[in-house]
UniProtKB/Swiss-Prot annotation:
Its cofactor is Fe(2+). The lineage of its organism: Eukaryota, Fungi, Dikarya, Ascomycota, Pezizomycotina. The keyword Methyltransferase applies. S-adenosyl-L-methionine binds at G119, K125, D146. Catalyzes the SAM-dependent triple methylation of the alpha-amino group of histidine to form hercynine and subsequent conjugation with cysteine and oxygen to form hercynylcysteine sulfoxide, the first two steps in the biosynthesis pathway of ergothioneine. Ergothioneine is an unusual thio-histidine betaine amino acid that acts as an antioxidant against peroxide in conidia and contributes to conidial longevity. Residues 631-650, 732-761 are annotated as: Disordered. Residues 378-874 are annotated as: Hercynylcysteine S-oxide synthase. It comes from Neurospora crassa (strain ATCC 24698 / 74-OR23-1A / CBS 708.71 / DSM 1257 / FGSC 987). It is found in: Cytoplasm; Nucleus. Its main location: cytoplasm. In the N-terminal section; belongs to the methyltransferase superfamily. EgtD family. In the C-terminal section; belongs to the EgtB family. This is Ergothioneine biosynthesis protein 1.
Amino acid sequence: MPSAESMTPSSALGQLKATGQHVLSKLQQQTSNADIIDIRRVAVEINLKTEITSMFRPKDGPRQLPTLLLYNERGLQLFERITYLEEYYLTNDEIKILTKHATEMASFIPSGAMIIELGSGNLRKVNLLLEALDNAGKAIDYYALDLSREELERTLAQVPSYKHVKCHGLLGTYDDGRDWLKAPENINKQKCILHLGSSIGNFNRSDAATFLKGFTDVLGPNDKMLIGVDACNDPARVYHAYNDKVGITHEFILNGLRNANEIIGETAFIEGDWRVIGEYVYDEEGGRHQAFYAPTRDTMVMGELIRSHDRIQIEQSLKYSKEESERLWSTAGLEQVSEWTYGNEYGLHLLAKSRMSFSLIPSVYARSALPTLDDWEALWATWDVVTRQMLPQEELLEKPIKLRNACIFYLGHIPTFLDIQLTKTTKQAPSEPAHFCKIFERGIDPDVDNPELCHAHSEIPDEWPPVEEILTYQETVRSRLRGLYAHGIANIPRNVGRAIWVGFEHELMHIETLLYMMLQSDKTLIPTHIPRPDFDKLARKAESERVPNQWFKIPAQEITIGLDDPEDGSDINKHYGWDNEKPPRRVQVAAFQAQGRPITNEEYAQYLLEKNIDKLPASWARLDNENISNGTTNSVSGHHSNRTSKQQLPSSFLEKTAVRTVYGLVPLKHALDWPVFASYDELAGCAAYMGGRIPTFEETRSIYAYADALKKKKEAERQLGRTVPAVNAHLTNNGVEITPPSSPSSETPAESSSPSDSNTTLITTEDLFSDLDGANVGFHNWHPMPITSKGNTLVGQGELGGVWEWTSSVLRKWEGFEPMELYPGYTADFFDEKHNIVLGGSWATHPRIAGRKSFVNWYQRNYPYAWVGARVVRDL
């Protein structure tokens, strides 16, 4: 169960009306001297009556009741008593740890930092840390985040008078708190986020990682998180912590039934007919305790017969083994800095953002025009994982894709390319060995139809240099770059900055190139720094969340394409762009209709079967080890109605087909809800079969602009209180979600009624970078993610589930295009009428690229290996 200190609705829950609805924005505004900042974006409504009904009568699975029922006013009072019980080791252990180690913990938090505690309480625990910080003379701003003003006032009223520590309240949900931390005035402040009381144990394990990952994204390189985790694996000790000899815990649990009756408005549960069953369940992940209601006899509740042997789950508390804690941190993009434990049963873990964790928030991932040295270090950490851990030594000289150089080329190409650009702009001598520029400057990208046709490239040696020599050279170039940052990023001239920026984005793009090459090899090693996903579980969850793929009317609108970045500019704060991103221009795009999400693996498989196409996309494989052609598929035209449901794929096909991932082959049955990635020619045939076509470059940009407008419109409505976000999910495992499930609402599908023309005034392209929050880019997952729950939402830039997006537009020279001086052949070499523009980004695309609205990528239309998907559009 959560600790009293971490409860959010708190005493506010005692005011729940009999209807089960309580609008927390109507809390009494009590007079208080407490400094409480209202950060709520919208009034929050908790409809427990609906939750009770839906969980008591589930469509599938066992009966449950929302854990939030336990935390009305009386429940909080009872739980406060529980935290003082000898058996309840969680609070006692945490206090012992803080008493002994608070001074050491405080040493990790610098003066001038802010501390944000997720949930407020009686300060019994956090005061120990605040006192240590105050004694150290550190100026600290402490913020207690809670959804209840009354709870914040009560908490802050108990704060002792500190000399250096200032205490504040944040009134809002966890989501509100995260948005507050994302604000420009807060995002760059040093911070430490506290999540005490082992409240993380009330989440399912996958949800716990998702929750933490949300806050990881707002952490800077020097920020920290301090998280309490229950690791007790003594069954008796765990059991008695939740089943005390005095019986207070069972009284606390039974009080939930009394609260349910008040909310329902009738005596649905007769208290005397129910008892509490607590049980400890052992598993290799660390075990858990769970609590149930069980009737003492057969009884009727809300028209349902509940047998005496039936049970209704109300609460669970997961325990974490050392291995599971490490899995949790790595999945959430965190690394452990230090830990303090009480024996083997409880620990406080100090965590920092992993070097490979790329933020999806524009004010973080693009906080300066030039990537920072921290950005470079994160990039190098990722590059080194791919090249030194996943790429076997014996595979370096192989060509997983025959149209590309051997893998070893890319090890030398990345530092050589950067060194060449630095040499051009600094006028200094190249790094040694200088002859590397002859063999590593530029790779090959030949014509798929005729590989003899290829742009100018470096000579291919008879024998590549030894790996050790290449890695030494790599470190030499990295050291050279670090030297340019030695006097501060603001002192780097614009022309040298452009060379650094070009080298940075060049390396970003080649990580993806190397990875999609490695995906074609059965010798690629699984990344070990993150846990292997449970693809079966992920598939079952995706299937349960499917919604129809709706059509949206994209209104006629004028959009901006490109950015302003003069080659001879001197403003170091202006963002850089490649030659194909310039000059900026306005274009008119006619109205059309677009589906909300891209084509999935399942839809593509149905297309193959119905059209009797044997050729699989290169992203798939046959499990019977048949050879897979590396050629291109025959184009297929035709029309097929876009049905919301189709016949099920035959088991014989599913059993023999898999999708390629860095984790090896994943059975197609586990990846049906993923976006398919294939060549343009392959997907164009599928789009025609589905009753549409692939959008043009301008139409795709128009989709992104309109998707942004819809988001802003929805956010404006939230500000006005028209929509209802959920409350803090730390309160319960199943009763309350962090983010409410999607439902067709303001984003009305075109079939019924499209947003009015007046909504087009909301469309804006003044911001260069997109907020990618929730997008599967930037290595937040190392594989595509299910996308079928997004059909009722118009997905925007980078939001296609981990794939780029094809457009039907050929890459051609446009008016005003000028080749860039540093790399004149970057785009110009591909004006051959064979390449189409792609937009967005994949799961392996850095946010600086995936989120930049002006960025343009391209591939040959029949190139089968790139991670590019497509959505279907149609004319009005």
